[in-house]
Structure formats: structure tokens, C-alpha cells
Amino acid sequence: MKTSNTKTPKPVLIAGPCVIESLENLRSIAIKLQPLANNERLDFYFKASFDKANRTSLESYRGPGLEKGLEMLQTIKDEFGYKILTDVHESYQASVAAKVADILQIPAFLCRQTDLIVEVSQTNAIVNIKKGQFMNPKDMQYSVLKALKTRDSSIQSPTYETALKNGVWLCERGSSFGYGNLVVDMRSLKIMREFAPVIFDATHSVQMPGGANGKSSGDSSFPPILPRAAAAVGIDGLFAETHIDPKNALSDGANMLKPDELEHLVTDMLKIQNLF
């Protein structure tokens, strides 16, 4: 999952459902992810969103909200011992979410929002900034620098080492390719790893924005393929959304992997890592 010259101690795995549907649903997924969470070769984080604030349609399910969502994530943390990732969409959410989450994620659409990046960077959580579908990967260095300078004002330019030390990561999730489609330019992984650790988002990278009459669609045959290519290029970790029953998931089901599919994928990626 990372090449031999990578300085992160272990490959990172971030996995869980797109959005919190219920505590029972979180538990069922968390149980299925235990083999991966217990893999000593991986640095595992359980992920779920308390609010999907950028759904295409007003009618789409968003989640339980900040307070109830964080309570459920804290329950998973307590019961399973998992570290937690969740995303924040507004500045006021950062300090509250950081009481539960070990990683706070900046959504791709908000990757240039200075106030949000600064507020998240003022917490003790790792900052995971998703590259916007509209962004030149090289320009993500400026988002990284916003976070780094918030944490250490003496930093003048971002490097992989300073970003790793200060807990600032980037996440590749594809680039717009005309309307309603995304592609992954594998060159972006190398470009962004010049100034930050890079996580590859296996499931959102195959999304088709707005492709399902008010909802995003995707092709679940591709999430097992692109991460293998990313592992060969060199990455620091994998982000993948997973669900027991993807077809009936309340958000992004078309892109999700079942837990057993994710386990097979990670096994293959670790094998690829050993080739380099």
C-alpha cells in the first residue's frame, strides 16, 4: 500500500459506511471489519459521517446530525477500541467533533475553505483534506500549508516530512472528466506526496456525480481495481466505504464494497506493496 521509501510507520486503512444510518448498522459493519482492524500491519480507522451536507437533492438522507452522530461514533470507539474519522462541513463543528474523532476530514468541495481548514487544524486531530474534483493536485500544497502554518507558524513550505510530523494528510478521490464522471490521474499521487502523505479513496474515485436522478451513482466493479494501481504508484493508505448491504445503503451504495471484498482488496494491496 506504500512503497519502501514511505516514512509512515504502517499503511493506513480508513473504512466504514458513508453515513451513519443507525447504531445497529454501525455495529454490524464494525464487527465485520474486525479482521482488518486487528491486522498488525495496518493502522486502522473506522469512518462514518454524522451529516452528508452536500447531497445532490434536498430529499436525500443526510444522517443523524452532529450530537447524535458523535454519540454513536463514541459508542463504537468504546465498544471496539477503534480510532475514528469523521468529516466536518462547518467551522463550529471542528472542536466538538475532535472530542470523539482522531481524524477530522475536510470534504473535497471545501478543500480551499480557509476558515474551516484553520479551525480543524487548531484541534489535536489529524487533518485529512480531500482533493477537490476541480483541483490541480499541485495546488493542494496551499491547502496543506494553511493547515501546517496553523499548527506551526514557522513552517514556510510544505514537505512530506513536515506534514507527516504535524498530522496533515491529503486524500485523492478523482478529478472531473466532463459532466457526471470522474477519472483518476495516477500522476497526482506522486505530485501530492511531495508535500504530504496521501490516502487513496477507492470508492468515491469511481463515483458518477449526479448520475442517478438527484443522487450520485457509480460502478462497484471499479473500486477493487484502481487501488491496486495506486498501491503500485505509492500511497500511504486506503480510504474505502463499506456496507453489509450496499444496494440498500442510504448514501453512495453504488460505490461501496462489502467487508469481505474490502478484505480481499487490502490483502492484494499489501502484496503489491512488497514488490517495491
From Swiss-Prot:
GO terms for cellular component: cytoplasm. Gene3D superfamilies: Aldolase class I. Its EC number is 2.5.1.55. Keywords: Cytoplasm, Lipopolysaccharide biosynthesis, Transferase. SUPFAM superfamilies: Aldolase. Pathway: Carbohydrate biosynthesis; 3-deoxy-D-manno-octulosonate biosynthesis; 3-deoxy-D-manno-octulosonate from D-ribulose 5-phosphate: step 2/3; Bacterial outer membrane biogenesis; lipopolysaccharide biosynthesis. Belongs to the KdsA family. This is 2-dehydro-3-deoxyphosphooctonate aldolase. The gene is kdsA.
